[in-house]
Amino acid sequence: MEFKRCSGILMPISSLPGGYGIGSMGKPAHDFVDFLAKAGQTIWQILPVGPTGYADSPYQSCSAFAGNPYFIDLDLLAADGLLTKKDYAAINWGGDAAHVDYGTLYEKRFAVLRKAYANFLKKRPVPGYETPYPDDWYRFRFLSSDWLPDYCLYMAIKEANGMVDWQQWPRALRVREPEALAEFKAEHAGEIEFWAFLQYEFDRQWRALHAYAKEKGVAIMGDIPIYVAADSADAWAGRELFETDAEGKPRRVAGCPPDYFAADGQLW
């Protein structure tokens, strides 16, 4: 079998230059695709694009399927009428443009995204009614139905419990008692939908970026973590798929021994 030789550059989306604290899938990403094409490169290698948690690592994500809301481009949301420039342009996203301040992002980015969600609610379609915006909302929900509901519920519960590990949630929610979940869904329906909105917007921008890269002859080569994280929607919603104890904690873990980069070794 013959393979065509090709070359490219590794550039995490988070490392793209931008004015709002972290790289995004808008102009910064499209400009980088243009740079690759002009340089004769045909591959853009990225790191995993899943949501990051307290460790701020793309290899420790709370979902094997969801996208990182931090990568949603605010200017594109503004272009869609979901934000105005004054909603985010004057915010201090961190004092060092060369580094991502994840603490600041967590405190300020979601507040801006909630403004976008509030404006989205004024436009989103209502089942049974004719509306021009947006037809792909339901299509996305349908195509993501095997993971999105559990992820959104997980994030809403996590938010309501101070973002602690799901193994520290109230037992009824931790073990997914039907009555407890039904009660939580009824009381936090708006919060659950907020997390669905973020994934919808991520998906729209991600697909647009892929299409643009393909048009320019650039393939995006991704990466994924070796394991699903213990503190994830996947582990919480699919405990039967994992070897855990009665509390949901992994019975066995893996990693690698100490080396030059990690004196204490790594626990994956």
Residue ranges of model-derived segments:
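Short, solvent-exposed turn/loop segments enriched in Gly/Ser/Thr/Pro and often Arg
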Residues: Q45-A55, I224-A230
